[in-house]
Amino acid sequence: MSGLRTVSASSGNGKSYDSIMKILLIGDSGVGKSCLLVRFVEDKFNPSFITTIGIDFKIKTVDINGKKVKLQLWDTAGQERFRTITTAYYRGAMGIILVYDVTDERTFTNIKQWFKTVNEHANDEAQLLLVGNKSDMETRVVTADQGEALAKELGIPFIESSAKNDDNVNEIFFTLAKLIQEKIDSNKLVGVGNGKEGNISINSGSGNSSKSNCC
């Protein structure tokens, strides 16, 4: 695995910022990655979200410990046919959010495979966070204690969230960004890349979009 290098950055419209953080959301299809991202960036919720095809990203600039930080947030497709495409985006990621659906035990079980993929393709310095989404649902099958236990086993922080109710959504991104900023401040991790404002979708293959429930 390669390390991350520093690049001084400023946006095209003349506004400067201290660093860019590239953050990925990964996990099985339908766990609500896109809904978490849209809730955080746009404060919107759509219960029937179009499944991500390939890669999508959004930008949000936030204040982290007094520093202006541009978050480049990448939403990856969870379907198996896109794994080769999406793993290419792990390199250079400063933070990775592993998401499962608390109403679907399979997505929880698969987190270990996602974690293995991260170890194979991401930088050693990347900060990780486990998220159990759809915590508002009464049909929960994965308990918070199970999530905590898995996070402890993997050695990473854990948060439960609901994109629908806007529970802990901001906490997810700010917690991870603060961990990254602490590494940057201690010179163990450094900002990378230049971001472009907006929402870009990269499609690949001949797969069709499909709707999935999003909470």
UniProtKB/Swiss-Prot annotation:
GO CC terms of this entry: cellular bud neck; endoplasmic reticulum; endosome; incipient cellular bud site; mating projection tip; mitochondrial outer membrane; mitochondrion; plasma membrane
SUPFAM superfamilies membership: P-loop containing nucleoside triphosphate hydrolases
Membrane topology of the entry: Lipid-anchor
PROSITE patterns per UniProt: RAB
Cellular compartments annotated: Cytoplasmic vesicle, Secretory vesicle membrane; Cell membrane; Cytoplasm
GO biological process per UniProt: ascospore-type prospore assembly; autophagy; exocytosis; Golgi to plasma membrane transport; membrane addition at site of cytokinesis; protein transport; vesicle fusion
Residues holding GTP: 27-34, 75-79, 133-136
Chief location bin: membrane
Swiss-Prot/TrEMBL keywords: Cell membrane, Cytoplasm, Cytoplasmic vesicle, Exocytosis, GTP-binding, Lipoprotein, Membrane, Nucleotide-binding, Phosphoprotein, Prenylation, Protein transport, Transport
Motif placement: Effector region: 49-57
Domain of life: Eukaryota
Modified sites of kind Phosphoserine: 201, 204
CDD domains to which the protein is assigned, alphabetical: Rab8_Rab10_Rab13_like (cd01867)
Ranges in a coiled coil: none
Lipidation (S-geranylgeranyl cysteine): 214-215
GO molecular function, one term: GTP binding
The keyword GTP-binding is annotated on this UniProt entry: yes
Known partners and oligomeric status: Interacts with the guanyl-nucleotide exchange factor SEC2. Interacts with SRO7, YIF1, YIP3, YIP4 and YIP5.
Function: Involved in exocytosis. Maybe by regulating the binding and fusion of secretory vesicles with the cell surface. The GTP-bound form of SEC4 may interact with an effector, thereby stimulating its activity and leading to exocytotic fusion. SEC4 may be an upstream activator of the 19.5S SEC8/SEC15 particle. SEC4 probably interacts directly with SEC8; it could serve as the attachment site for the SEC8/SEC15 particle.
Family: Belongs to the small GTPase superfamily. Rab family.
The name this protein goes by in its record: Ras-related protein SEC4
Organism this protein belongs to: Saccharomyces cerevisiae (strain ATCC 204508 / S288c) (Baker's yeast)
